[in-house]
């Protein structure tokens, strides 16, 4: 199965595009929207590119959550990051709680803030822990 992936790189931190060309490896066939807000990027991608997966960073407020909901409702999977101290704390934020209650994400990966992003825990779409092997 072929995966059509897209990346919304709002601040240029993920793909580090120079003259429209990603300098970091984001996948050979990944469409990158550089410098475009999620609120503009998600609808544009859904209408024009029909990706299976949309990657974006740092969800924070209600507008970001609405973008994820729009992508999810149109059948696209979303890969996103959120800064937080624990899954429960993040899931209970008013702006993001609807994403968790509707189970918009299949997997939650918790990373340590120390040691270069070491995986500290995995949780399924219901928030149940998945053992690390």
Spell out what each predicted region is.
Residues 1-45:
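P-loop NTPase switch/communication element
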Residues 7, 31-34, 80, 110, ...:
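Structural signal for conserved beta-strand scaffold positions within catalytic alpha/beta enzyme cores
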Residues 14-17, 88-90, 116-120:
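Switch/connector loops and helix/strand junctions flanking conserved nucleotide-binding motifs
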Residues 23, 49-51, 55-109, 113:
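Conserved P-loop NTPase nucleotide-binding/switch module
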Residues 24-27, 98-100, 127-131:
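Short, low-complexity, polar/charged sequence segments that are solvent-exposed and flexible
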Residues 39-40, 66, 97, 129:
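A broad, structure-centric signal for solvent-exposed, well-ordered loop/edge residues
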Residues 107-133:
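Conserved P-loop NTPase
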């Amino acid at each position: 199965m072929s995966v059509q992936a897209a990346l919304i790189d709002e601040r240029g931190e993920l793909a580090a595009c120079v003259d429209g060309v990603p300098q970091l490896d984001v996948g050979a066939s990944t469409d990158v929207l550089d410098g475009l807000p999620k609120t503009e990027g998600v609808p544009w991608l859904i209408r024009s590119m029909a990706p299976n997966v949309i990657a974006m960073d740092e969800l924070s407020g209600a507008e970001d959550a609405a973008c994820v909901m729009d992508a999810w409702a149109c059948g696209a999977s979303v890969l996103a990051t959120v800064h937080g101290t624990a899954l429960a704390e993040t899931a209970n934020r008013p702006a993001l709680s609807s994403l968790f209650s509707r189970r918009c994400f299949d997997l939650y990966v918790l990373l340590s803030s120390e040691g270069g992003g070491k995986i500290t825990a995995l949780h399924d779409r219901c928030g149940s822990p998945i053992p690390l092997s």
